[in-house]
Amino acid sequence: MAHFLETQEPLVFSGKKRNDRDDEDGDALVAKKSALAVCDADPAAAIANIRHEFGEHGGVNMSIEASATFTVMEPDTMRRMFTGELGPDNDFYVYSRHFNPTVLNLSRQMAALEGTQAAYCTSSGMSAISSVMLQLCSSGGHVVAASTLYGGTHALLSHFLPRTCNITTSFVDITDHGAVANAIVEGRTQVLYFESVANPTLTVADIPELSRMAHEKGVTVVVDNTFAPMVLSPAKLGADVVVHSISKFISGGADIIAGAVCGSENLVKEMMDLRGGSLMLLGPTMNAKVAFELSERIPHLGLRMREHSHRAQVYAERMRDLGMKVIYPGLETHPQHKLFKGMVNRDYGYGGLLSIDMETEEKANKLMAYLQNATQFGFMAVSLGYYETLMSCSGSSTSSELDPSQKEAAGISPGLVRMSVGYVGTLEQKWTQFEKAFLRM
């Protein structure tokens, strides 16, 4: 695996212009696009190093390829595309469920962001997760997963996959490496799945050690990095596949639903195979117009994450000083603070999420009501990564798919408030609003 990581480089393809049919055979195979290394220790630098796509008429922004289907100049070209001889790496496209130039550009950005060879962008985060699991696991297969996960993912693993595909999951405390090792059944377990920073407890996974353990037993490591884009780079730390809900921090506008699968070039090719690829056959296709919107936001993701993280750090420290039970990886009291500090990319802080344990749902709801309706500190809403602060009581919302015993095992108390810290207004202005609401408690 170490050798694989050393040679893993995102692919950046050069452009191709189609001319008329007199140019060679009319649909001439332009020399296969060269791969240019864009790996960089800093994700922002890696994103900046990929080729900038200009518009069709020289616009500084790329054009939106809104076509569902694509024409060819010669009949034989169609056959060559369906046999795999020609494809997107040569700038040949068939149908936008397969590949689309605008979506492919966003995929290149996502690969650069995560430091992987390739990526494929999907219609939602859950479609990315489910497609990966269905590709990597066969009927009768076994998964080991963290007990603390987003509720939708937990439901997929604990209910949907066993019922429809006979794929079972053992849930374990991801910080208990002995339990993880014991849960892996060599020769049967196919995937180790966890979140880089757990939703909603903000437990931090030891990605390098967990990856080492899994690879020793031939298990593929899949990491959901939705909570920590820019902050953590799981693939560089040993993970094989990184999944995202792009709807969150990467979008930043709470207006788009999207996802991504980031991994090796071989994985993406397998998932897009005409006969056996989960992405190809399930069709969780991203709209080109959505891809264009997102591609315009990724260049300033680093700036946004720095401010999310900065404010979350300040708020967490001040909440702690008020005597609140606050959970944030940037606090030295966090159980995995040193671990997280050793894994993060420099200058992006510890992430834009914090959690407050109010002990009971009644107290949690009371605080959130004051914060929204009395002082306008933030909004009661699920999701995260928005420029306004979003807050929800996880046990009764995004983790409601878990039963009481599962919530207890995951460390989700009835009064746990997950807070995605925004950056509108001044820091002191927003803190004053928080303090006023807290004092009313």
From Swiss-Prot:
Deletion consequences: Increased leaves, flowers and seeds methionine content, and leaf and root S-methylmethionine content under conditions of sulfate starvation. Reduced MGL-mediated isoleucine biosynthesis from methionine.
EC number: 4.4.1.11
Gene3D superfamilies: Aspartate Aminotransferase, domain 1, Type I PLP-dependent aspartate aminotransferase-like (Major domain)
GO biological processes: cellular response to sulfate starvation; cellular response to water deprivation; methionine catabolic process via 2-oxobutanoate; protein homotetramerization; transsulfuration
Region annotated Disordered, chain positions: 1-25
Cellular component aspect of the GO annotation: cytosol
Tissues where this protein is expressed: Expressed in roots, stems, siliques, leaves, flowers and seeds after imbibition (at protein level). Transcripts accumulate in dry mature seeds, but at protein level, only present upon imbibition.
Enzyme class: lyase
Entry-annotated residues carrying N6-(pyridoxal phosphate)lysine: 248
Keywords attached to this entry: Cytoplasm, Lyase, Pyridoxal phosphate
Segments crossing the lipid bilayer: none
Disulfide-bonded cysteines: none
An example molecular function term from Gene Ontology annotations: pyridoxal phosphate binding
Subunit structure, interactors included: Homotetramer.
Protein's UniProt name: Methionine gamma-lyase
Species name: Arabidopsis thaliana (Mouse-ear cress)
